[in-house]
């Protein structure tokens, strides 16, 4: 029974980590577009998310050679 509870808790933690990363990658793209073009996707090229402690670093790149980083903070409810 203890082994089952341990395996179940590990699975829940892994699921939480994956869901935070997916949400943060989506937030990364939205923040890039919102901060530079006020929601216009015309010049958007790519957004890459890298998880870090208590948040993540978001790399934004646009077709007009504009590149910058944004730091996203995880907020768990």
Curated annotation (Swiss-Prot):
Protein name, as recorded: Putative neurotoxin 3
Gene Ontology molecular functions: toxin activity
Signal peptide region: 1-25
PTM per Swiss-Prot/TrEMBL: Contains 2 disulfide bonds.
GO CC annotation, single: extracellular region
Family: Belongs to the scolopendra neurotoxin 3 family.
Record propeptide residues: 26-46
Location within or outside the cell: Secreted
Alphabetized UniProt keyword annotations: Disulfide bond, Neurotoxin, Secreted, Signal, Toxin
Chief location of this protein within or outside the cell: secreted
Tissue occurrence: Expressed by the venom gland.
């Amino acid at each position: 029974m203890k082994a089952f509870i341990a395996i179940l808790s590990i699975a829940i933690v892994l699921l939480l980590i994956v869901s935070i990363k997916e949400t943060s990658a989506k937030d990364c793209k939205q923040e890039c577009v919102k901060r530079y073009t006020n929601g216009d996707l015309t010049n958007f090229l790519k957004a890459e998310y890298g998880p870090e402690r208590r948040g993540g670093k978001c790399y934004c790149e646009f077709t007009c050679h504009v590149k910058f980083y944004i730091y996203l903070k995880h907020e768990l409810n």
